């Protein structure tokens, strides 16, 4: 599963107010569309949905010419959109549930609503620590549905939780040549460390300039 953070030079993903549009360039956003098009599913959280009302779909006009040649408009397949929503906060008002293609809500209890699109629920237990969905069981359920390539776009806490559970196969970071300052929101949120030996380590798989930004692809060393 691939996790995507977008960052400034000082490792920030948004201002303290939550403003993040746009830290990175149009070239980086086009590159993200290319990755989305290749994924079986896109995974995000109810917190991201409520904060940004994102579409989390593939926009053909935003793809590179190379990817357009592989995926003609008439045969474009939308990845399944998956939202962790343990508190049933996502409603039919959000665009992610209204667009073409399948949308799955990973919840701990069912709540029937009049969805406009192809929306269904996956019911899972909590993780035992808080009221959040058990992410390991979620990935197992997705595997049973033959959803094997999951592209993650979320905030720092969810990305950190996936990393600590060993559920990230690749971490892709787009770094913009900007500095957002001390009060801005961080890249990843993980448990406090008591020594440097506990710090997660990575292997740099690739480093590429995308427009004015840098894309770093990292493999966790679990």
Question: Over which residues does each language-model region extend?
Answer:
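Active-site ligand-binding patch in enzyme domains
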Residues: 5-9, 13-149, 157-160
């Amino acid at each position: 599963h691939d996790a995507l953070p977008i960052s400034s030079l000082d490792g920030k993903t948004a201002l303290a107010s939550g403003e993040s549009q746009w830290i990175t360039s149009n070239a980086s956003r086009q590159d993200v569309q290319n990755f989305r098009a290749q994924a079986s599913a896109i995974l995000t959280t109810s917190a991201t949905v409520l904060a940004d009302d994102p579409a989390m779909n593939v926009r053909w006009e935003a793809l590179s010419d190379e990817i357009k040649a592989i995926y003609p408009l008439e045969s474009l397949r939308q990845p399944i959109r998956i939202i962790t929503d343990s508190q049933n906060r996502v409603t039919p008002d959000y665009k992610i549930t209204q667009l073409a293609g399948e949308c799955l809500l990973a919840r701990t209890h069912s709540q029937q609503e009049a969805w406009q699109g192809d929306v269904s629920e996956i019911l899972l237990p909590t993780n035992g620590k808080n009221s959040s969905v058990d992410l390991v069981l979620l990935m197992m359920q997705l595997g049973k549905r033959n959803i094997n390539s999951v592209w993650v776009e979320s905030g720092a806490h969810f990305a950190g939780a996936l990393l600590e559970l060993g559920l990230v196969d690749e971490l892709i970071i787009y770094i913009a040549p900007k500095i957002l300052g001390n009060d801005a929101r961080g890249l990843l949120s993980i448990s406090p460390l008591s020594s440097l030996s506990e710090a997660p380590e990575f292997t740099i798989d690739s480093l590429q300039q995308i427009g004015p930004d840098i894309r770093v692809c990292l493999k966790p060393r679990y």
